[in-house]
């Protein structure tokens, strides 16, 4: 039920990256649910992970492995989150890494594991071990779309995008894939994203690039306000192109940053459009705050309000629910006489009261659209922010009520 989400575009290969998938029977029948992303030696890697205190075992292991090594393989499974599994979960993740490391002739610390799926169940290690030799054999540079499908859980469509640009007179590619549909309010930061570029970029510079991209994309979305135990976003740089970016002051860095942010934003918005049960894509704009933090407070309070989200689902211009969300957002000393509210281009509230020219018909017209913008002006500063969310439908309840059955 993706809200205005188009079919997966053609994903461009990234020199130095090969990908493969296999049906390991982790939770799903007759569909790939295990994937690896192999990266050439000498590549660099940046990553951000969930800040959920109950982070999953693969997050713990991936952080450890990434601390002192450049990874050669990403190992990803769908259907089992390996979260809430204690020490055994960590042992299981390490065991799977060791199996792939033996196949690849690398140290187990050169493997980064990632999992998504049901929380609280032990990883079926033997099934993964049995399937790894098969996935190893089918890796290819064109496997991006296959991996995008293999890592899906409640997603209804695979998500991926590519950007190709010229820098220093040479071509550069950035390709990324992601999964996510529910339990979405990333704080990097169930959401996983994997990006790669063929530019040559030192790890610290790559980390800065990813952090900026994530801040303007994945950390600006919410489906249901729940932050997963398994959130992770990875950016690989293979150095296989002729473009080398040594510092953030390098003129080429700005071009790479723009491309990475574009890919991140496309993936993040695709996750929202594929939000569990989503029928509408909602942009919440808050301007006129004293700082970004209070703009975020207001935006997220609106975006995560069940009453606002169900009003959007019903195409009901119930602006009182939005005002209530603004009022309870916790902005200190908020003067309501400075607040204005817009549904699309229609001004509903001006100076804290109903605009005399607003009509219910205007509101219904806006709320009936597939893409809705809710805009708030606080009238107390110059800060502004955008958050993206979706509506809350009957299907969301059904999907999550039946998730483990």
Curated annotation (Swiss-Prot):
What EC identifiers does the entry list? 2.3.1.35, 2.3.1.1
Question: One GO CC annotation, please?
Answer: cytoplasm
User: What is the catalytic activity of this protein?
Assistant: N(2)-acetyl-L-ornithine + L-glutamate = N-acetyl-L-glutamate + L-ornithine; L-glutamate + acetyl-CoA = N-acetyl-L-glutamate + CoA + H(+)
Location comes to: Cytoplasm
| Listed GO MF terms | glutamate N-acetyltransferase activity; L-glutamate N-acetyltransferase activity
Catalytic site positions: 190
UniProt keywords (A-Z) are: Acyltransferase, Amino-acid biosynthesis, Arginine biosynthesis, Autocatalytic cleavage, Cytoplasm, Multifunctional enzyme, Transferase
Which family does this protein fall into?
Answer: Belongs to the ArgJ family.
Q: Which organism is it from?
A: Nitrosococcus oceani (strain ATCC 19707 / BCRC 17464 / JCM 30415 / NCIMB 11848 / C-107)
Q: Subunit notes for this chain?
A: Heterotetramer of two alpha and two beta chains.
Protein name from the UniProt record: Arginine biosynthesis bifunctional protein ArgJ
Identify the pathway.
Answer: Amino-acid biosynthesis; L-arginine biosynthesis; L-ornithine and N-acetyl-L-glutamate from L-glutamate and N(2)-acetyl-L-ornithine (cyclic): step 1/1; Amino-acid biosynthesis; L-arginine biosynthesis; N(2)-acetyl-L-ornithine from L-glutamate: step 1/4
- Which Pfam families does the record associate with it? ArgJ
Listed binding positions for substrate are: 153, 179, 190, 276, 400, 405
């Amino acid at each position: 039920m993706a809200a205005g989400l188009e079919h997966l575009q053609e994903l461009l290969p990234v020199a130095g990256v090969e990908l493969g998938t296999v049906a390991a029977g982790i939770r799903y029948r007759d569909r790939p649910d295990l994937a690896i992303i192999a990266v050439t030696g000498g590549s660099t890697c940046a990553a951000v992970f969930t800040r959920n205190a109950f982070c999953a075992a693969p997050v713990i292991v991936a952080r450890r492995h990434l601390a002192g090594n450049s990874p050669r393989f990403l190992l990803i499974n769908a259907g089992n989150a390996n979260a809430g599994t204690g020490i055994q979960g960590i042992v299981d993740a390490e065991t799977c890494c060791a199996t792939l490391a033996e196949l690849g002739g690398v140290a187990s610390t050169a493997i980064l594991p990632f999992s998504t799926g049901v929380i609280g169940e032990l990883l079926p290690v033997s099934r993964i071990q049995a399937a790894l030799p098969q996935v190893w054999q089918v890796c290819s540079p064109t496997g991006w779309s296959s991996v995008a499908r293999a890592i899906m859980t409640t997603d209804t469509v695979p998500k991926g995008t590519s950007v190709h640009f010229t820098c220093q007179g040479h071509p550069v590619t950035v390709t990324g894939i992601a999964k996510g549909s529910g339990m979405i309010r990333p704080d990097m930061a169930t959401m996983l994203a994997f990006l790669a570029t063929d530019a040559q970029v030192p790890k610290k510079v790559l980390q800065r690039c990813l952090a900026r991209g994530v801040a303007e994309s994945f950390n600006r979305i919410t489906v249901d306000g729940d932050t997963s135990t398994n959130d992770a976003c990875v950016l690989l740089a293979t150095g296989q192109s002729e473009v080398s970016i040594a510092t953030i002051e390098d003129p080429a860095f700005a071009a790479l940053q723009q491309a990475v942010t574009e890919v991140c934003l496309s993936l993040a918005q695709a996750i929202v459009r594929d939000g569990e049960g989503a029928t509408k894509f909602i942009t919440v704009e808050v301007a006129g705050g004293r700082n970004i933090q209070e703009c975020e407070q207001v935006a997220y309070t609106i975006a995560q309000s069940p009453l606002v989200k169900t009003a959007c689902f019903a195409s009901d211009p119930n602006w009182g629910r939005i005002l209530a969300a603004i009022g309870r957002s916790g902005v200190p000393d908020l003067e309501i006489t400075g607040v204005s509210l817009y549904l699309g281009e229609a001004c509903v509230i001006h100076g804290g009261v109903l605009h005399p020219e607003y009509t219910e018909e205007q509101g219904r017209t806006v709320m009936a659209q597939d893409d809705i913008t809710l805009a708030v002006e606080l009238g107390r500063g110059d800060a502004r922010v955008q958050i993206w969310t979706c509506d809350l439908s009957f299907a969301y309840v059904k999907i999550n009520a039946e998730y483990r059955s």
